[in-house]
Amino acid sequence: MILTTAVFSGHKTLYGPFGIAGFAKKKGIALEPIIFGGTGVDSANQGMPDILPYRYEAGSQNIQAVAGLHAALTWLADKTDIMDVEKANHRKLLQILGRHSNIHIVGPKNRENCIGVVSCVFDGYSPNNMGDVFDELEIAVRTGLECAPLAHKTLGTFPAGTVRFSVGYFTKENDFEALEQALTYIEENS
C-alpha cells in the first residue's frame, strides 16, 4: 500500500500529551484548510496563506503540547524494546480476559497486529455500569462509544458500546494482578 496521507493523534501510542495531532501528505496532494484565521503570517488575508505549514495552522499553536510531543518522540527514539514490551503486555491482557467466561472480546480474532487496546462486553451488564464498578475497584477503563459511534455500529455494539482496556509500555505486573483480582471479584459477585 502506498500512503498519500497520514493523520495521527499525539497521545495514542506515541505517549505525547492530549491536544496535539499531526498529518503528513505526499507532495502534490492538495488539501483545503477547514479552519481559517489567526496565522500571524498574512493577517490582512481573510483566507489562509499558501505558504506551508502556515496554510494549515489556524490560531495559536498549542506550544506546550508541541513540546510534550517532541519530548515523547525523543524518548521513543531511544527505546528499542517498546514494541516487544507492548506486544507482551497485550498478550497478557488477552490471557487474563480470556480466563473469564462472562467477558466477550469485540474485534478481530487474530490480534497479532493489534495495539494494546481491547474492547469487551460483559454478560448482563452495560458498559457504563461496568465502568462504575471498575472505577470503584480503581481500574481505569473507557466505556461507551469511545468517540467512535460509527465503529460501534459496524461492530454491532451500538448504542451501548464496550468496556475498553488499554495496556502499553508502562503497564506493570501489579497492574495485571489488580485487573485479575477485579475480574475475579466481578465474576464471583455477578
Residue ranges and their predicted role:
Residues M1-S190:
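Pyridoxal 5′-phosphate
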